Regions:
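Short alpha-helical
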Residues: 4, 78-79, 105, 182-183, ...
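A cross-domain feature marking catalytic cores of carbohydrate-active enzymes
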Residues: 1, 73-75, 101, 121-123, ...
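C-terminal active-site rim and adjoining tail of enzyme catalytic domains
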Residues: 47, 122, 130-213
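Metal-dependent phosphodiesterase/phospholipase catalytic core, i.e.
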Residues: 13-113, 142-170
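Structural detector of well-ordered beta-strand residues that form the stable sheet scaffold
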Residues: 10, 70, 98-100, 118-120, ...
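Short acidic, Gly/Ser-rich segments with clustered Asp/Glu that frequently serve as metal-coordination loops
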Residues: 1-10
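Short gly/pro/ser/thr-enriched loop/turn and capping motifs at secondary-structure boundaries
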Residues: 18-19, 107, 126-129, 203-205
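Alpha-helical scaffolding within the catalytic cores
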Residues: 53-59, 125-136
């Protein structure tokens, strides 16, 4: 999530619209209406002219009322935290979302403003938890409810059977990104991870169903 020029929470990964749309410039330099008029599928085969514009968070929450969502905040900014929570409340979606970010400040703002919404560990919190797992020093009552993490960070292994056990002992679920290979999916599931974040949901659904049989 990012904020448009007029302070609306919009669903967009990059800081600029250049890579994915037919527009140019920073997301923060355009209003929500201007972002909505762009072609969000412009640079993707088969989606040019068909994907619509950059959506607002409240539109997505209302369109997919039966879907549980992870909302990632791309700015370490308290205003983004508050406006995101406001959108979640307005859509009556508090019970079906979790919020993640690399930034500690924005996650602390979410937790203070709406304690009912589960949040992921920030990069700093994840790093500390990983170190503690290496020395078998348990986390006591963490502020976060999820790890939303890659299996590897550079040359450092984040997710391992030990890390998953450590997280579960602390009451924290482990969601791993970005897992597109089926053999990786099966291995991670065998370690007990709670969710796979993937660019290939078609593969992931089949692997998860097979593992549950």
């Amino acid at each position: 999530m990012r904020l448009s020029r007029d302070g609306v929470v919009v669903v967009h990964h990059d800081a600029t619209v250049d890579r994915t749309t037919n527009g140019r410039g920073p997301v923060a330099g355009l209003t929500a209406d201007e972002l909505a008029r762009l072609d969000a599928g412009y640079h993707f085969d088969g989606f040019r002219g068909r994907a619509g514009g950059v959506p607002r968070l409240d539109e997505v929450l209302r369109r997919y009322r039966d879907v549980r969502l992870i909302i990632e905040l791309k700015l370490n900014d308290a205003q983004l935290a508050q406006r995101t929570v406001d959108a979640v409340r307005a859509a009556d979606a508090v019970e079906r979302v979790s919020i993640g970010s690399f930034g500690t400040r924005v996650l602390r703002a979410v937790r203070e403003y709406e304690p009912r919404i589960p949040s992921g560990a920030s990069r700093e919190e994840t790093r500390l938890a990983l170190y503690r797992s290496w020395v078998r020093w348990p986390v006591r009552r963490p502020a976060y409810k999820e790890f939303q993490v890659p299996e590897m960070s550079g040359s450092t292994r984040v997710v391992s059977p030990r890390f998953v056990r450590y997280a579960h002992d602390a009451g924290v679920v482990v969601r791993v990104w970005t897992v597109n290979d089926e053999s990786d999916m099966r291995r991670l599931l065998s370690w007990g991870v709670d969710a796979l974040i993937s660019d290939r949901p078609d593969r992931a659904v089949e692997v998860v169903r097979a593992a549950a049989r």
